């Protein structure tokens, strides 16, 4: 997208810079028929890969869907877990999982994970199968990346809820995180052009890694060596959630967050 903006800007500057030459051309002995070749002896011709029509929907449809989808995943996940504390059913929840916090969280979130994954695959089918948005890779790499993104985003939601185990607080927190992720994912403004602290902060959001992986798959499919850092980062979000599960279990058993409104 930045290339198209730069090209349009250069075209405008070229037109403005040629205006004085056009005015002085008769005095220089250049005829009207010779002016085009005199002013522009070489004409550039651009052929964008995978998007020859320069249709912005090709660039924006897929990332924008998942940018907004991650907000829904965050909100639904924290509410699914937080409702156990809000409605004071945390003890029964843990007893059903035999006091194993990992089993309790997986059992609670697995139905949502399946639903979100189906929605992601269906969205990819609509965009790439029905709307015929061009892409450079196979269909399954896109779906596997979307599934990994769903699980990583849910893991981030579990991590945030473990830090703030009160649903009244964490709803606001994940809403802010979702908004920041949408801003810093690099879809509408290149992350490399942001201030250095903001640039590095963008990698704290799963959606940023998802966008980088997807751009590699859609516009070149350069292979795993170019995206292994992003894939590893998505798995790292799952480890963060696992680290704070004991704290979440303690918060549920303490009952001190049940009265926070």
Labelled PLM ranges:
Residues 1-76:
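Transport-system extracytoplasmic interface segments
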Residues 36, 45, 49-53, 93-106, ...:
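Juxtamembrane loop-helix boundary motifs flanking transmembrane segments in multi-pass membrane proteins
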Residues 114, 122-126, 134-261:
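Membrane-spanning alpha-helical segments of multipass transporters and channels
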Residues 50-127:
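Hydrophobic alpha-helical transmembrane segments of multi-pass membrane transport proteins
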Residues 20, 24, 73, 89, ...:
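Short amphipathic alpha-helical interaction/hinge segments
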Residues 15, 19, 26, 75, ...:
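Generic macromolecular interface patches on structured domains
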């Amino acid at each position: 997208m930045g290339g198209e903006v730069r090209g349009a800007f250069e075209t405008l500057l070229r037109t403005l810079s040629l205006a004085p030459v056009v005015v002085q051309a008769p005095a220089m002995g250049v005829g009207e028929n010779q002016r085009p070749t005199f002013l522009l002896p070489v004409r550039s011709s651009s052929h964008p890969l995978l998007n020859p029509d320069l249709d912005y929907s090709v660039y924006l449809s897929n990332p924008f869907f998942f940018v907004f989808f991650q907000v829904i995943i965050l909100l639904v996940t924290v509410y699914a877990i937080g409702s156990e504390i809000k409605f004071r059913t945390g003890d029964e929840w843990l007893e059903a999982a035999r006091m194993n916090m990992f089993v309790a969280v997986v059992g609670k979130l697995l139905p949502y994970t399946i639903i979100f994954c189906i929605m992601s695959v269906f969205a990819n089918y609509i965009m790439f199968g029905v709307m015929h948005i061009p892409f450079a890779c196979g269909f399954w790499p896109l779906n596997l990346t979307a599934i990994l993104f769903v699980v990583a985003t849910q893991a981030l939601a579990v991590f945030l809820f473990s830090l703030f185990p009160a649903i009244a607080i964490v709803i606001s927190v994940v809403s802010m995180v979702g908004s920041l992720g949408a801003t810093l994912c690099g879809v509408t403004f290149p992350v490399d052009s942001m201030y250095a602290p903001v640039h590095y902060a963008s990698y704290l959001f799963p959606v940023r890694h998802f966008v980088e992986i997807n751009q590699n798959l859609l516009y070149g499919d350069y292979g795993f060596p170019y995206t292994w850092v992003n894939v590893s980062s998505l798995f790292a979000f799952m480890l963060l959630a696992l680290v704070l599960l004991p704290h979440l279990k303690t918060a549920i058993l303490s009952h001190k967050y049940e009265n926070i409104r």
